[in-house]
Amino acid sequence: ARVQALKPTDAIDASYRRDLLEAFEDSGATLPAAQRERVKAIREELDKIGLAFQKRVNEDGTTVAMSVADLKGLPASWLKDRQRDAQGHVRVGLDYPSYIPFMQNAVSEDARHRLWLAAQNQGGVENIERLDRAVALRREMAAIYGVPDFASFTLKRRMAGTPANVQEFLARVRGAVEAGEKREMTELRADKAKMLGKPVEQVKLERWDVAFHQERIQRERYQIDQEGLRAYFPTEASVAYALRVAQQLYGIEFVPAKVATWHDDVRYYDVFDLKDGQRGDFLGGVYLDLFPRDGKYNHAAAFGVAPASKLTGQRPTSALVTNFNRQGLNHEELE
């Protein structure tokens, strides 16, 4: 009521007032008490499901046993220090530095297929059950708000507006890229046929073939070897260079500092404004968590750790989480 009573003085105030009122409405503040409590319970359960889902993926230690024949095509730098089981097989995990190079370089289609299947099933049946439960909860919440589905509820405050608009946009994108996609898939299929010595008509391009034949074509046509590039971009030197570029580009300075971290691999920097070569105001802090390990988030992302506050003068802190190869970076990782 207090927000509704406010009279905006300009367009910015009006927009902010509208956003606040819509946020209250979406939180369930205008619903009858029983429905409001149910929405609260649904949101809490969805949060728990999301955390449990990601935790299960992070802690999934699935590995696939690969024989010497399965490893044909993998560079020596990748094979170095790989763990082997009692039968002498290399255990290949699903972390990025293991999975991506394997899918790009392993000559054996069967080996790529087995690793791809393991990746598709990461998290197991438990996570499928969690997804089913999340879908049901979202459907229930949409019904409480009187909209046909959760997509409609999510999009109503966003630029797209409706699921129909999203589908129309995706159809336009599909129309723009479809011809190019068909050309590329035809090219990859032809490369597979060439490698197998079979007519193209007898060859089917599978999902686990795509990265391998893309890499093969790059090597043959452009002499680009993603794994070979790692020797030219050592990880530590590349990270240090990226920080220097950021310093020059944004007029800031990264200063290493010793603080408590959640793992020995994690490093922390204070970030300062830099004026005329002189260190200025403290702007915030950033953690770098660069390398894979068991139980860690297995993608790349930037997370907020602590927000800024004008009231207390607190500066923001964030964390950059990646899963880089310790031996060096390829072109995609360097980007």
Predicted segment positions?
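Structured ligand/cofactor/substrate-binding pocket environments in proteins
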Residues: 123-130, 239, 331-335
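Extended, charged alpha-helical coiled-coil/arm scaffolds that mediate oligomerization and mechanical coupling
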Residues: 11-53, 57
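Long, charged all-alpha helical bundle/coiled-coil segments in cytosolic proteins
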Residues: 1-9
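Active-site-proximal, well-structured secondary-structure segments within enzyme catalytic domains
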Residues: 16-18, 45-48, 55, 59-93, ...
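Short, charge-rich amphipathic alpha-helices with coiled-coil/heptad character
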Residues: 103-119
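Second-shell loop/turn segments in exported
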Residues: 24-28, 98-102, 119-124, 154-166, ...
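Short conserved micro-motifs at the rims of enzyme active sites and ligand-binding pockets
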Residues: 103-105, 297-299, 330-334
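A conserved hydrophobic secondary-structure block that centers on an alpha-helix together
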Residues: 28-42, 121-153, 164
